Design a protein with these regions (language model features):
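C-terminal helix-to-coil terminal segments
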Residues: 2-4, 14-15, 19, 91, ...
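Phosphate-binding beta-alpha-beta segment of Rossmann-like dinucleotide-binding domains, i.e.
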Residues: 93-147, 159-162, 166
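Glycine-rich Rossmann-fold phosphate-binding loop(s) that bind the pyrophosphate
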Residues: 153-154
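A short helix->loop->beta-strand "cap" motif at the edges of active sites that frequently abuts
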Residues: 69-74, 93-95, 169, 223-225, ...
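Phosphate-coordination loops involved in phosphoryl transfer and adenosine-cofactor binding
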Residues: 2, 72, 144-147, 224
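Rossmann-like adenosine-cofactor binding region
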Residues: 63-66, 177-266
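N-terminal glycine-/charge-rich "phosphate-binding" loop or analogous flexible N-terminal tail
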Residues: 1-51, 172
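N-terminal Rossmann-like NAD(P) cofactor-binding module of classical short-chain dehydrogenase/reductase
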Residues: 55, 76, 203
Length: 302
């Protein structure tokens, strides 16, 4: 008997029709999010009404919402993070939760290095000046010999580290869950404070559910540090980041994730902040692979 599945990521199937075509082979009732945005918490219960299976995005699946979805049996996430899902509730109630950790690695790593190069080489300002017919030349910075501190050294963190090393950067990392004996010895494991003190560039790739960079951490950093975050919005205290960017203690930043999305905060007023709308995984190959894996994960779990 064919069953109902809900698909909540608003971009699902836009890059390739293959994931949706595969679902149609097994489900005759497919509910798609056509709003173009994340489903708000107030609408999740209605959207999930009477379904056993979901291809999930970043919608709120806390216990207060899951408790109103007694039919739900499988949540298959398009993406890595599971912060939006109450995993204790799903475990206690025999709801399977799956994710797609592998496909995003290359895309997020590429985007991180793109941002690091753009900020280090002052690409944004050169482009802006020339479009204003200002022929301004200034000396920028190379990644060669720069100290890179990576917070979180899983799949993405390690790939980012390798990319930086190709440019001659010196890479150290902090990750309490990774044993250094399992990591290439070109990377140095350090304590969190040590990494902050020596970094020219800090790149966050952590699964921590805590704030990582606040006032105290910024005070430890070198002047002109570059901050990169494609991990979690709450990993950086936004007010502290704003103040340090404005004072030029931090030279610049790239932020792809925010506490509240869509983002409308004060960082948009700063020229030294590159802000992107949570699109590090938005390459054609990555989106298709993530969606296909999410579909296959769901089918395997049924």
């Amino acid at each position: 008997m064919k069953k109902k599945v809900v698909i909540t990521p608003s971009s699902f199937g836009q890059v390739s029709s293959k994931p949706l075509e595969k679902l149609k082979q097994y489900f005759d009732d497919i509910v798609i999010n056509n709003t173009g945005k994340k489903i708000p918490s107030s609408d999740v219960v209605n959207f999930y009404d009477n379904t056993q299976y979901s291809i999930a995005g970043l919608e709120d699946l806390s216990s207060s919402i899951l408790s109103h979805l007694p039919s739900l049996r499988v949540i298959s996430r398009v993406g890595i993070g599971l912060d939006n899902i109450d995993l204790k509730y799903t475990s206690d109630n025999n709801i399977k939760v799956l994710n797609t950790p592998d496909p995003p690695t290359a895309a997020v790593s590429e985007m991180t290095i793109t941002a690091a190069l753009s900020l280090s080489r002052n690409l944004i300002n050169y482009n802006k000046d020339l479009h204003m017919k200002h022929w301004n030349k200034s000396v920028s910075n190379s990644l060669k010999n720069k100290n890179i501190f990576i917070i979180g050294f899983g799949r993405i963190g390690q790939k980012v580290g390798k990319y930086f090393s190709f440019f001659g950067s010196k890479v150290c990392y902090y990750d309490p869950y990774i044993e250094s004996k399992n990591i290439d010895n070109i990377f140095k494991k350090v304590e969190f404070k040590e990494g902050l003190l020596q970094a020219d560039i800090i790149s966050i790739h952590s699964s921590s559910k805590s704030e990582l960079l606040g006032d105290a951490e910024f005070k430890l950093m070198k002047d002109n540090v570059i901050i990169l975050n494609s991990s979690r919005g709450y990993h950086i205290n936004e007010l502290a980041l704003f103040q340090n960017l404005k004072s030029k203690k931090a030279s610049s930043c790239w932020i792809d994730v925010f506490r509240e999305e869509p983002y409308k905060g004060d960082l948009i007023t700063l020229d030294n902040a590159i802000l992107t709308p949570h699109i590090s995984t938005y390459t054609k190959i990555c989106r298709e692979e993530m969606e296909m894996q999410a579909v296959q994960n769901l089918l395997n779990a049924i």
